[in-house]
Protein backbone atom coordinates (compact mmCIF):
# COMPACT_ATOMS: atom_id res chain seq x y z
CA UNK A 1 0.00 0.00 0.00
CA UNK A 2 1.43 3.38 -0.99
CA UNK A 3 2.08 6.03 1.62
CA UNK A 4 1.02 9.49 0.51
CA UNK A 5 3.21 12.27 1.92
CA UNK A 6 3.16 16.04 1.32
CA UNK A 7 5.38 17.25 -1.50
CA UNK A 8 7.30 19.41 0.96
CA UNK A 9 8.14 16.34 3.05
CA UNK A 10 9.24 14.41 -0.02
CA UNK A 11 11.54 17.23 -1.13
CA UNK A 12 12.98 17.54 2.39
CA UNK A 13 13.76 13.82 2.41
CA UNK A 14 14.74 13.00 -1.16
CA UNK A 15 15.25 16.35 -2.83
CA UNK A 16 13.28 18.03 -5.62
CA UNK A 17 11.44 16.09 -8.31
CA UNK A 18 9.68 16.80 -11.62
CA UNK A 19 8.29 20.32 -11.77
CA UNK A 20 10.21 21.64 -8.77
CA UNK A 21 12.25 24.79 -9.36
CA UNK A 22 15.72 25.30 -7.90
CA UNK A 23 17.45 28.67 -7.77
CA UNK A 24 21.10 28.68 -8.83
CA UNK A 25 23.15 30.56 -6.26
CA UNK A 26 21.96 34.12 -5.78
CA UNK A 27 21.25 34.53 -9.48
CA UNK A 28 17.77 34.93 -10.92
CA UNK A 29 18.19 31.65 -12.83
CA UNK A 30 15.70 28.91 -11.95
CA UNK A 31 16.18 25.30 -13.04
CA UNK A 32 13.12 23.04 -13.27
CA UNK A 33 13.53 19.26 -13.14
CA UNK A 34 12.30 17.82 -16.44
CA UNK A 35 12.43 14.08 -15.69
CA UNK A 36 12.85 11.84 -12.62
CA UNK A 37 14.35 8.37 -13.13
CA UNK A 38 13.68 7.19 -9.58
CA UNK A 39 10.88 4.90 -8.45
CA UNK A 40 8.85 6.52 -5.70
CA UNK A 41 9.12 4.45 -2.54
CA UNK A 42 12.36 2.80 -3.67
CA UNK A 43 14.71 5.76 -3.35
CA UNK A 44 18.17 4.93 -2.03
CA UNK A 45 19.27 6.91 0.99
CA UNK A 46 22.17 6.14 3.29
CA UNK A 47 22.26 6.80 7.04
CA UNK A 48 20.76 5.74 10.32
CA UNK A 49 17.35 4.23 9.75
CA UNK A 50 17.65 4.74 5.99
CA UNK A 51 17.29 2.31 3.11
CA UNK A 52 20.83 1.54 1.93
CA UNK A 53 21.55 -1.38 4.25
CA UNK A 54 22.03 -5.10 3.90
CA UNK A 55 19.03 -6.85 2.41
CA UNK A 56 17.19 -3.61 1.67
CA UNK A 57 18.62 -1.27 -0.98
CA UNK A 58 21.98 -3.05 -0.69
CA UNK A 59 22.33 -6.53 -2.14
CA UNK A 60 23.41 -9.27 0.27
CA UNK A 61 24.84 -11.48 -2.46
CA UNK A 62 26.38 -9.35 -5.22
CA UNK A 63 30.17 -9.25 -5.21
CA UNK A 64 32.40 -6.95 -7.21
CA UNK A 65 33.12 -9.83 -9.55
CA UNK A 66 29.64 -9.07 -10.85
CA UNK A 67 30.23 -6.35 -13.48
CA UNK A 68 26.88 -4.76 -12.58
CA UNK A 69 27.97 -3.87 -9.04
CA UNK A 70 28.89 -0.21 -8.56
CA UNK A 71 32.00 1.21 -6.93
CA UNK A 72 30.18 4.45 -6.09
CA UNK A 73 26.52 5.43 -6.11
CA UNK A 74 25.50 9.08 -6.03
CA UNK A 75 21.84 8.92 -5.12
CA UNK A 76 18.80 11.18 -5.59
CA UNK A 77 20.85 13.90 -7.22
CA UNK A 78 19.67 16.71 -9.46
CA UNK A 79 21.68 16.76 -12.69
CA UNK A 80 22.28 19.82 -14.85
CA UNK A 81 23.91 18.73 -18.09
CA UNK A 82 24.04 20.10 -21.61
CA UNK A 83 23.30 16.67 -23.12
CA UNK A 84 21.16 14.94 -20.47
CA UNK A 85 19.10 17.99 -19.58
CA UNK A 86 17.92 18.89 -16.09
CA UNK A 87 16.91 15.63 -14.45
CA UNK A 88 16.76 13.70 -11.18
CA UNK A 89 18.53 10.33 -10.96
CA UNK A 90 21.11 8.15 -9.29
CA UNK A 91 24.56 8.16 -10.89
CA UNK A 92 26.40 4.85 -10.98
CA UNK A 93 30.19 4.73 -11.22
CA UNK A 94 32.49 1.78 -11.81
CA UNK A 95 36.18 1.66 -12.73
CA UNK A 96 36.30 5.45 -12.85
CA UNK A 97 33.57 5.83 -15.46
CA UNK A 98 29.87 6.62 -15.40
CA UNK A 99 28.05 3.35 -16.08
CA UNK A 100 24.48 4.36 -15.35
CA UNK A 101 22.06 7.26 -14.99
CA UNK A 102 18.93 5.79 -13.48
CA UNK A 103 17.87 3.87 -10.37
CA UNK A 104 20.54 2.27 -8.18
CA UNK A 105 19.79 -0.34 -5.55
CA UNK A 106 19.10 -4.01 -4.89
CA UNK A 107 17.12 -5.80 -7.63
CA UNK A 108 16.27 -8.60 -5.17
CA UNK A 109 14.07 -6.26 -3.14
CA UNK A 110 13.38 -3.24 -5.36
CA UNK A 111 11.53 -2.52 -8.58
CA UNK A 112 13.02 -0.87 -11.66
CA UNK A 113 16.69 -1.02 -10.63
CA UNK A 114 18.83 -0.16 -13.65
CA UNK A 115 20.49 -3.49 -14.54
CA UNK A 116 24.09 -2.32 -14.12
CA UNK A 117 23.52 -0.14 -11.04
CA UNK A 118 23.52 -2.69 -8.20
CA UNK A 119 24.52 -1.45 -4.77
CA UNK A 120 26.48 -4.09 -2.90
CA UNK A 121 28.97 -4.40 -0.08
CA UNK A 122 31.58 -3.09 -2.54
CA UNK A 123 29.71 0.18 -3.14
CA UNK A 124 30.39 3.56 -1.55
CA UNK A 125 27.30 5.79 -1.36
CA UNK A 126 26.77 9.53 -1.14
CA UNK A 127 23.40 11.20 -0.66
CA UNK A 128 22.82 13.74 -3.40
CA UNK A 129 19.26 14.64 -2.47
CA UNK A 130 19.96 18.34 -1.98
CA UNK A 131 22.87 18.67 -4.37
CA UNK A 132 23.35 19.45 -8.05
CA UNK A 133 25.72 17.34 -10.15
CA UNK A 134 27.44 18.77 -13.20
CA UNK A 135 30.18 17.49 -15.46
CA UNK A 136 33.66 18.72 -14.64
CA UNK A 137 34.44 21.92 -16.49
CA UNK A 138 36.96 22.23 -19.32
CA UNK A 139 39.18 25.30 -19.68
CA UNK A 140 40.85 25.47 -23.09
CA UNK A 141 42.87 28.66 -22.58
CA UNK A 142 45.51 27.90 -19.97
CA UNK A 143 48.81 29.74 -19.79
CA UNK A 144 50.88 27.25 -17.78
CA UNK A 145 52.67 29.99 -15.84
CA UNK A 146 52.55 28.19 -12.49
CA UNK A 147 51.36 24.75 -11.37
CA UNK A 148 49.29 26.22 -8.53
CA UNK A 149 46.66 27.20 -11.11
CA UNK A 150 45.36 23.63 -11.06
CA UNK A 151 44.18 23.87 -7.47
CA UNK A 152 42.37 27.15 -8.06
CA UNK A 153 40.73 25.72 -11.18
CA UNK A 154 39.45 22.55 -9.55
CA UNK A 155 38.08 24.59 -6.65
CA UNK A 156 35.73 26.26 -9.17
CA UNK A 157 34.74 22.97 -10.79
CA UNK A 158 37.26 22.77 -13.63
CA UNK A 159 38.64 19.25 -14.08
CA UNK A 160 40.33 19.54 -17.50
CA UNK A 161 42.92 22.19 -18.39
CA UNK A 162 44.13 22.62 -21.97
CA UNK A 163 46.79 25.14 -22.93
CA UNK A 164 50.51 25.62 -23.10
CA UNK A 165 53.60 27.06 -21.54
CA UNK A 166 56.59 26.09 -19.48
CA UNK A 167 56.44 28.34 -16.42
CA UNK A 168 56.96 32.08 -15.89
CA UNK A 169 58.91 32.75 -19.09
CA UNK A 170 57.94 35.68 -21.28
CA UNK A 171 56.68 33.36 -24.01
CA UNK A 172 54.32 31.65 -21.59
CA UNK A 173 53.16 34.91 -20.01
CA UNK A 174 51.84 35.96 -23.41
CA UNK A 175 51.09 32.77 -25.35
CA UNK A 176 49.61 29.35 -24.61
CA UNK A 177 52.30 27.28 -26.33
CA UNK A 178 54.64 24.60 -25.05
CA UNK A 179 57.34 24.79 -27.72
CA UNK A 180 59.08 21.62 -28.87
CA UNK A 181 59.71 18.11 -27.60
CA UNK A 182 62.00 19.03 -24.69
CA UNK A 183 59.52 21.43 -23.13
CA UNK A 184 56.54 19.17 -23.85
CA UNK A 185 58.26 16.21 -22.19
CA UNK A 186 59.22 18.24 -19.13
CA UNK A 187 55.68 19.55 -18.77
CA UNK A 188 54.20 16.06 -18.85
CA UNK A 189 56.65 15.01 -16.16
CA UNK A 190 55.98 18.14 -14.10
CA UNK A 191 52.20 17.73 -14.15
CA UNK A 192 52.05 14.20 -12.76
CA UNK A 193 51.11 15.61 -9.35
CA UNK A 194 48.35 17.92 -10.61
CA UNK A 195 44.79 16.67 -9.92
CA UNK A 196 43.29 17.60 -13.31
CA UNK A 197 43.22 16.24 -16.84
CA UNK A 198 45.71 18.10 -19.00
CA UNK A 199 46.46 18.72 -22.67
CA UNK A 200 49.26 20.81 -24.16
CA UNK A 201 49.35 22.97 -27.28
CA UNK A 202 52.53 22.96 -29.31
CA UNK A 203 53.75 26.20 -30.85
CA UNK A 204 51.87 26.51 -34.11
CA UNK A 205 53.79 29.52 -35.40
CA UNK A 206 55.92 28.04 -38.15
CA UNK A 207 55.47 28.24 -41.91
CA UNK A 208 57.13 24.86 -42.50
CA UNK A 209 55.44 21.57 -41.63
CA UNK A 210 58.09 19.39 -40.00
CA UNK A 211 58.73 21.59 -36.91
CA UNK A 212 54.98 21.42 -36.27
CA UNK A 213 54.64 17.69 -36.84
CA UNK A 214 57.39 16.83 -34.39
CA UNK A 215 55.53 18.65 -31.62
CA UNK A 216 52.36 16.67 -32.31
CA UNK A 217 54.35 13.42 -32.21
CA UNK A 218 55.87 14.62 -28.92
CA UNK A 219 52.41 14.75 -27.34
CA UNK A 220 50.76 18.05 -28.23
CA UNK A 221 46.99 17.62 -28.52
CA UNK A 222 46.87 20.61 -30.84
CA UNK A 223 48.72 23.65 -32.13
CA UNK A 224 48.36 27.24 -30.97
CA UNK A 225 48.96 30.19 -33.27
CA UNK A 226 49.60 33.50 -31.48
CA UNK A 227 50.15 36.95 -32.90
CA UNK A 228 53.15 37.58 -30.64
CA UNK A 229 54.97 34.86 -32.60
CA UNK A 230 53.53 36.14 -35.90
CA UNK A 231 50.05 34.98 -36.99
CA UNK A 232 50.69 35.22 -40.73
CA UNK A 233 48.69 33.53 -43.49
CA UNK A 234 51.64 31.20 -44.17
CA UNK A 235 51.73 30.14 -40.51
CA UNK A 236 47.96 29.60 -40.43
CA UNK A 237 48.02 27.47 -43.56
CA UNK A 238 50.92 25.33 -42.34
CA UNK A 239 49.37 24.66 -38.93
CA UNK A 240 46.05 23.68 -40.47
CA UNK A 241 47.74 21.36 -42.97
CA UNK A 242 49.44 19.52 -40.10
CA UNK A 243 46.21 19.49 -38.10
CA UNK A 244 44.27 17.97 -40.99
CA UNK A 245 46.93 15.32 -41.50
CA UNK A 246 47.32 14.39 -37.81
CA UNK A 247 43.77 14.97 -36.49
CA UNK A 248 44.46 17.69 -33.94
CA UNK A 249 42.88 21.09 -33.37
CA UNK A 250 44.35 24.51 -34.10
CA UNK A 251 43.65 27.40 -31.74
CA UNK A 252 44.38 30.94 -32.84
CA UNK A 253 44.95 34.39 -31.37
CA UNK A 254 44.81 36.52 -34.50
CA UNK A 255 46.72 39.60 -35.61
CA UNK A 256 45.56 42.64 -33.59
CA UNK A 257 47.78 45.04 -35.51
CA UNK A 258 46.66 43.71 -38.90
CA UNK A 259 50.36 43.53 -39.80
CA UNK A 260 50.08 40.72 -42.32
CA UNK A 261 46.48 41.16 -43.31
CA UNK A 262 43.00 41.83 -42.06
CA UNK A 263 40.31 39.45 -40.82
CA UNK A 264 39.33 38.68 -44.40
CA UNK A 265 42.91 37.62 -45.15
CA UNK A 266 42.99 35.36 -42.11
CA UNK A 267 39.71 33.73 -43.11
CA UNK A 268 41.08 33.25 -46.62
CA UNK A 269 44.15 31.52 -45.17
CA UNK A 270 41.93 29.32 -42.99
CA UNK A 271 40.06 28.42 -46.17
CA UNK A 272 37.03 26.77 -44.59
CA UNK A 273 39.03 24.49 -42.30
CA UNK A 274 37.89 24.15 -38.70
CA UNK A 275 39.67 26.36 -36.16
CA UNK A 276 39.13 27.39 -32.54
CA UNK A 277 39.32 31.17 -32.12
CA UNK A 278 40.38 32.49 -28.73
CA UNK A 279 38.79 35.62 -27.13
CA UNK A 280 36.81 36.15 -30.30
CA UNK A 281 35.53 39.54 -29.11
CA UNK A 282 39.05 40.96 -29.35
CA UNK A 283 39.95 42.46 -25.97
CA UNK A 284 42.26 39.51 -25.41
CA UNK A 285 43.72 40.04 -28.87
CA UNK A 286 42.77 39.62 -32.50
CA UNK A 287 42.11 41.67 -35.62
CA UNK A 288 41.07 45.16 -34.49
CA UNK A 289 38.29 46.13 -34.52
CA UNK A 290 36.33 43.32 -36.18
CA UNK A 291 37.66 39.92 -35.08
CA UNK A 292 34.22 39.40 -33.53
CA UNK A 293 32.92 38.78 -37.07
CA UNK A 294 34.77 35.44 -37.09
CA UNK A 295 31.94 34.00 -34.98
CA UNK A 296 29.60 33.98 -37.98
CA UNK A 297 31.55 31.38 -39.94
CA UNK A 298 30.46 27.71 -39.81
CA UNK A 299 34.05 26.43 -39.52
CA UNK A 300 34.95 28.71 -36.60
CA UNK A 301 34.54 27.48 -33.00
CA UNK A 302 34.42 30.82 -31.15
CA UNK A 303 35.43 31.22 -27.52
CA UNK A 304 35.53 33.96 -24.92
CA UNK A 305 37.95 34.46 -22.08
CA UNK A 306 36.55 35.42 -18.73
CA UNK A 307 37.97 38.93 -18.05
CA UNK A 308 35.31 40.45 -20.33
CA UNK A 309 32.56 38.26 -18.84
CA UNK A 310 30.18 39.88 -18.16
CA UNK A 311 30.49 43.51 -19.27
CA UNK A 312 30.56 45.65 -16.11
CA UNK A 313 31.41 49.23 -15.16
CA UNK A 314 34.93 48.11 -14.21
CA UNK A 315 35.78 46.05 -17.29
CA UNK A 316 37.48 48.70 -19.42
CA UNK A 317 39.77 50.20 -16.76
CA UNK A 318 40.92 46.78 -15.59
CA UNK A 319 41.74 45.60 -19.09
CA UNK A 320 44.10 48.42 -19.98
CA UNK A 321 46.37 47.68 -17.03
CA UNK A 322 46.24 43.92 -17.59
CA UNK A 323 47.14 44.28 -21.24
CA UNK A 324 50.21 46.39 -20.56
CA UNK A 325 51.60 43.72 -18.24
CA UNK A 326 50.73 40.61 -20.23
CA UNK A 327 52.13 41.77 -23.55
CA UNK A 328 55.19 43.62 -22.29
CA UNK A 329 53.97 47.06 -23.25
CA UNK A 330 55.26 50.38 -21.94
CA UNK A 331 52.93 53.26 -21.03
CA UNK A 332 55.74 55.66 -22.00
CA UNK A 333 55.70 54.44 -25.60
CA UNK A 334 52.85 56.00 -27.63
CA UNK A 335 52.70 53.06 -30.02
CA UNK A 336 52.22 50.64 -27.12
CA UNK A 337 49.42 52.76 -25.68
CA UNK A 338 47.74 52.89 -29.09
CA UNK A 339 48.04 49.11 -29.35
CA UNK A 340 46.31 48.70 -25.99
CA UNK A 341 43.56 51.19 -26.83
CA UNK A 342 42.80 49.44 -30.11
CA UNK A 343 42.03 46.19 -28.30
CA UNK A 344 39.76 47.45 -25.53
CA UNK A 345 36.41 48.45 -27.06
CA UNK A 346 33.28 48.84 -24.90
CA UNK A 347 31.04 48.38 -27.94
CA UNK A 348 32.34 44.93 -28.86
CA UNK A 349 32.52 43.79 -25.24
CA UNK A 350 28.85 44.73 -24.80
CA UNK A 351 27.98 42.82 -27.97
CA UNK A 352 29.86 39.79 -26.65
CA UNK A 353 27.33 39.44 -23.81
CA UNK A 354 24.48 39.26 -26.30
CA UNK A 355 26.27 36.95 -28.72
CA UNK A 356 26.72 34.48 -25.88
CA UNK A 357 23.03 34.70 -25.05
CA UNK A 358 22.13 34.13 -28.70
CA UNK A 359 24.31 31.02 -28.89
CA UNK A 360 26.72 32.63 -31.36
CA UNK A 361 29.72 32.46 -29.03
CA UNK A 362 30.05 28.83 -28.01
CA UNK A 363 32.87 28.37 -25.48
CA UNK A 364 34.02 29.99 -22.23
CA UNK A 365 37.61 29.85 -20.96
CA UNK A 366 39.98 31.70 -18.64
CA UNK A 367 43.23 33.01 -20.20
CA UNK A 368 44.82 32.13 -16.87
CA UNK A 369 47.22 34.71 -15.39
CA UNK A 370 47.41 36.33 -18.82
CA UNK A 371 44.38 38.63 -18.50
CA UNK A 372 42.03 35.95 -17.13
CA UNK A 373 41.33 34.23 -13.82
CA UNK A 374 41.60 30.45 -13.79
CA UNK A 375 39.32 30.00 -10.80
CA UNK A 376 36.41 32.03 -12.21
CA UNK A 377 35.41 30.35 -15.49
CA UNK A 378 32.29 28.76 -14.03
CA UNK A 379 31.36 31.81 -11.97
CA UNK A 380 31.75 34.29 -14.84
CA UNK A 381 29.65 32.08 -17.10
CA UNK A 382 26.67 32.19 -14.74
CA UNK A 383 27.14 35.90 -14.04
CA UNK A 384 26.82 36.48 -17.79
CA UNK A 385 23.70 34.32 -17.97
CA UNK A 386 22.10 36.20 -15.09
CA UNK A 387 22.97 39.60 -16.59
CA UNK A 388 21.43 38.58 -19.89
CA UNK A 389 18.22 37.40 -18.24
CA UNK A 390 17.97 40.73 -16.43
CA UNK A 391 18.61 42.75 -19.59
CA UNK A 392 17.03 40.59 -22.31
CA UNK A 393 14.35 38.62 -20.49
CA UNK A 394 13.54 34.94 -20.70
CA UNK A 395 14.68 32.68 -23.53
CA UNK A 396 11.57 30.80 -24.63
CA UNK A 397 8.22 30.59 -22.90
CA UNK A 398 8.53 27.43 -20.81
CA UNK A 399 8.23 29.35 -17.53
CA UNK A 400 11.73 28.50 -16.37
CA UNK A 401 15.32 29.14 -17.37
CA UNK A 402 16.16 25.60 -18.46
CA UNK A 403 17.12 26.44 -22.03
CA UNK A 404 19.36 29.32 -21.01
CA UNK A 405 20.93 27.15 -18.29
CA UNK A 406 21.68 24.35 -20.77
CA UNK A 407 23.07 26.85 -23.27
CA UNK A 408 25.46 28.32 -20.74
CA UNK A 409 26.63 25.11 -19.09
CA UNK A 410 27.50 23.77 -22.55
CA UNK A 411 30.00 26.61 -22.95
CA UNK A 412 32.44 25.18 -20.39
CA UNK A 413 31.62 21.46 -20.58
CA UNK A 414 30.60 19.71 -23.79
CA UNK A 415 31.50 22.37 -26.36
CA UNK A 416 35.20 22.71 -25.48
CA UNK A 417 35.30 18.91 -25.37
CA UNK A 418 33.87 18.71 -28.89
CA UNK A 419 36.26 21.39 -30.13
CA UNK A 420 39.31 19.45 -28.99
CA UNK A 421 38.30 15.90 -29.78
CA UNK A 422 37.76 14.73 -26.21
CA UNK A 423 33.95 14.60 -26.02
CA UNK A 424 34.05 10.80 -25.99
CA UNK A 425 35.84 11.04 -22.62
CA UNK A 426 34.58 14.17 -20.83
CA UNK A 427 32.21 17.13 -21.18
CA UNK A 428 28.95 15.58 -19.96
CA UNK A 429 27.61 13.01 -17.51
CA UNK A 430 26.65 10.58 -20.24
CA UNK A 431 27.22 6.88 -19.69
CA UNK A 432 30.70 5.74 -20.67
CA UNK A 433 32.53 8.95 -19.87
CA UNK A 434 35.06 9.58 -17.12
CA UNK A 435 33.35 10.15 -13.79
CA UNK A 436 34.60 13.73 -13.45
CA UNK A 437 31.70 15.08 -11.41
CA UNK A 438 31.21 18.34 -9.52
CA UNK A 439 28.70 18.46 -6.64
CA UNK A 440 27.15 21.77 -5.61
CA UNK A 441 24.74 22.92 -2.97
CA UNK A 442 22.19 25.02 -4.90
CA UNK A 443 22.95 28.13 -2.86
CA UNK A 444 26.64 27.86 -3.79
CA UNK A 445 26.12 26.81 -7.40
CA UNK A 446 28.68 28.28 -9.76
CA UNK A 447 30.89 29.53 -6.96
CA UNK A 448 32.00 26.89 -4.47
CA UNK A 449 31.47 23.14 -5.03
CA UNK A 450 30.94 20.74 -2.16
CA UNK A 451 33.43 18.34 -3.68
CA UNK A 452 34.94 17.32 -6.99
CA UNK A 453 35.32 13.73 -8.15
CA UNK A 454 38.00 12.67 -10.61
CA UNK A 455 37.41 9.33 -12.29
CA UNK A 456 34.96 8.36 -9.58
CA UNK A 457 37.14 9.23 -6.58
CA UNK A 458 36.86 12.38 -4.46
CA UNK A 459 39.78 14.64 -5.29
CA UNK A 460 39.03 18.04 -3.71
CA UNK A 461 36.45 19.05 -1.13
CA UNK A 462 35.42 21.73 1.31
CA UNK A 463 36.73 20.39 4.60
CA UNK A 464 36.71 21.63 8.15
CA UNK A 465 39.33 21.34 10.88
CA UNK A 466 41.00 17.90 10.51
CA UNK A 467 41.48 17.78 14.31
CA UNK A 468 37.80 18.40 15.02
CA UNK A 469 35.38 15.76 16.28
CA UNK A 470 33.26 16.08 13.10
CA UNK A 471 34.12 17.22 9.54
CA UNK A 472 32.31 20.56 9.58
CA UNK A 473 33.91 22.92 12.19
CA UNK A 474 35.65 26.04 10.94
CA UNK A 475 37.95 26.86 9.34
CA UNK A 476 36.33 25.25 6.29
CA UNK A 477 38.26 25.61 3.06
CA UNK A 478 39.25 23.52 0.07
CA UNK A 479 41.71 20.77 0.75
CA UNK A 480 43.09 18.00 -1.45
CA UNK A 481 41.44 14.68 -0.67
CA UNK A 482 42.73 11.14 -1.15
CA UNK A 483 42.00 11.24 -4.87
CA UNK A 484 44.62 13.99 -5.22
CA UNK A 485 47.24 12.11 -3.20
CA UNK A 486 50.15 9.94 -4.27
CA UNK A 487 49.46 7.26 -6.87
CA UNK A 488 45.69 7.76 -6.59
CA UNK A 489 46.23 11.14 -8.24
CA UNK A 490 47.95 9.65 -11.28
CA UNK A 491 45.16 7.08 -11.54
CA UNK A 492 42.45 9.74 -11.24
CA UNK A 493 43.56 12.13 -13.99
CA UNK A 494 44.62 11.73 -17.61
CA UNK A 495 46.65 13.41 -20.31
CA UNK A 496 44.93 14.22 -23.60
CA UNK A 497 47.42 13.78 -26.43
CA UNK A 498 47.63 13.18 -30.17
CA UNK A 499 47.15 9.72 -31.64
CA UNK A 500 50.64 10.05 -33.14
CA UNK A 501 52.13 10.40 -29.67
CA UNK A 502 50.21 7.38 -28.39
CA UNK A 503 51.60 5.41 -31.32
CA UNK A 504 55.08 6.68 -30.38
CA UNK A 505 54.49 5.48 -26.79
CA UNK A 506 55.41 8.75 -25.09
CA UNK A 507 54.11 7.34 -21.81
CA UNK A 508 57.05 4.94 -21.69
CA UNK A 509 59.47 7.41 -23.28
CA UNK A 510 58.79 10.09 -20.67
CA UNK A 511 58.30 7.75 -17.71
CA UNK A 512 54.89 9.20 -16.88
CA UNK A 513 52.18 7.35 -14.95
CA UNK A 514 48.95 9.06 -15.98
CA UNK A 515 46.87 7.47 -18.70
CA UNK A 516 47.28 9.01 -22.16
CA UNK A 517 44.08 9.32 -24.19
CA UNK A 518 44.16 10.30 -27.85
CA UNK A 519 42.03 13.13 -29.20
CA UNK A 520 39.79 12.10 -32.08
CA UNK A 521 37.61 13.77 -34.69
CA UNK A 522 39.10 17.26 -34.33
CA UNK A 523 38.88 17.97 -38.05
CA UNK A 524 35.36 16.68 -38.64
CA UNK A 525 33.53 19.14 -36.41
CA UNK A 526 32.02 22.53 -37.11
CA UNK A 527 29.92 25.18 -35.47
CA UNK A 528 26.85 23.04 -36.22
CA UNK A 529 28.10 20.40 -33.75
CA UNK A 530 28.35 22.72 -30.76
CA UNK A 531 25.52 22.07 -28.33
CA UNK A 532 22.94 24.87 -27.85
CA UNK A 533 25.51 27.34 -29.24
CA UNK A 534 25.64 26.90 -33.01
CA UNK A 535 24.11 30.08 -34.43
CA UNK A 536 25.84 31.63 -37.47
CA UNK A 537 24.14 34.98 -38.19
CA UNK A 538 25.74 37.69 -40.29
CA UNK A 539 27.86 39.98 -38.10
CA UNK A 540 29.15 43.42 -39.11
CA UNK A 541 31.25 45.99 -37.24
CA UNK A 542 31.32 49.72 -37.89
CA UNK A 543 35.06 50.46 -38.36
CA UNK A 544 34.85 53.89 -36.72
CA UNK A 545 32.21 53.57 -34.01
CA UNK A 546 32.73 49.80 -33.43
CA UNK A 547 28.97 49.19 -33.36
CA UNK A 548 28.16 45.52 -33.84
CA UNK A 549 25.18 44.42 -35.92
CA UNK A 550 23.69 40.94 -36.14
CA UNK A 551 21.63 40.35 -39.28
CA UNK A 552 21.43 44.13 -39.59
CA UNK A 553 20.27 44.81 -36.02
CA UNK A 554 22.49 46.83 -33.70
CA UNK A 555 23.22 44.82 -30.55
CA UNK A 556 24.44 46.42 -27.34
CA UNK A 557 23.77 46.44 -23.61
CA UNK A 558 24.59 48.49 -20.55
CA UNK A 559 27.47 47.50 -18.27
CA UNK A 560 26.39 45.86 -15.03
CA UNK A 561 26.82 47.80 -11.81
CA UNK A 562 26.56 44.65 -9.70
CA UNK A 563 26.68 40.93 -10.38
CA UNK A 564 25.57 37.82 -8.49
CA UNK A 565 27.94 35.15 -7.17
CA UNK A 566 30.29 37.89 -5.97
CA UNK A 567 30.84 39.65 -2.63
CA UNK A 568 28.12 37.64 -0.90
CA UNK A 569 30.42 34.62 -1.24
CA UNK A 570 33.91 36.05 -0.78
CA UNK A 571 35.81 38.08 1.79
CA UNK A 572 38.02 39.71 -0.82
From Swiss-Prot:
Class of this enzyme: hydrolase
Urease domain span: 136-572
EC number(s) from the headed UniProt entry: 3.5.1.5
Cofactor note: Binds 2 nickel ions per subunit.
Residues with the N6-carboxylysine modification: 224
Any single GO BP term: urea catabolic process
Catalyses which reaction(s): urea + 2 H2O + H(+) = hydrogencarbonate + 2 NH4(+)
Keyword Hydrolase appears in the UniProt entry: yes
Keywords: Cytoplasm, Hydrolase, Metal-binding, Nickel
One GO cellular component, as annotated: cytoplasm
Residues the entry annotates as binding Ni(2+) 1: 141, 143, 224, 367
Molecular function terms from GO: nickel cation binding; urease activity
Localization, UniProt: Cytoplasm
Biological or metabolic pathway of the protein: Nitrogen metabolism; urea degradation; CO(2) and NH(3) from urea (urease route): step 1/1
Residues the entry annotates as binding substrate: 226
Superkingdom, natural source: Bacteria
Obligatory cofactor(s): Ni cation
Chief subcellular location: cytoplasm
Positions annotated as active site in the UniProt record: 327
PANTHER family: UREASE
Assigned protein family: Belongs to the metallo-dependent hydrolases superfamily. Urease alpha subunit family.
Oligomer and partners: Heterotrimer of UreA (gamma), UreB (beta) and UreC (alpha) subunits. Three heterotrimers associate to form the active enzyme.
The protein, known as: Urease subunit alpha
Amino acid sequence: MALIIPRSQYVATYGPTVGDKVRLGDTDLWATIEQDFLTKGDECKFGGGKSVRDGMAQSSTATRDNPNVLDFALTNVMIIDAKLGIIKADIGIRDGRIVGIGQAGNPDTMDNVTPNMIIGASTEVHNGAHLIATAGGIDTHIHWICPQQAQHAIENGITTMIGGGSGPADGTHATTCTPGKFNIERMFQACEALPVNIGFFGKGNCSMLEPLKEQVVAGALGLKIHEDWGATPAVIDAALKVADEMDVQVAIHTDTLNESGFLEDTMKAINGRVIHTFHTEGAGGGHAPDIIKAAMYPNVLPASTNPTRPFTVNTIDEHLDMLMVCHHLDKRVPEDVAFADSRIRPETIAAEDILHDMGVFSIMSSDSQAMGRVGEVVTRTWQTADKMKAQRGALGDEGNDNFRIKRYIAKYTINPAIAHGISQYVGSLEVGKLADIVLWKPQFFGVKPEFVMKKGFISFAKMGDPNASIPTPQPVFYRPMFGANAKANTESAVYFVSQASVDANIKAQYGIQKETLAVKGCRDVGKKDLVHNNATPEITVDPERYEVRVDGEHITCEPATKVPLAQRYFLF
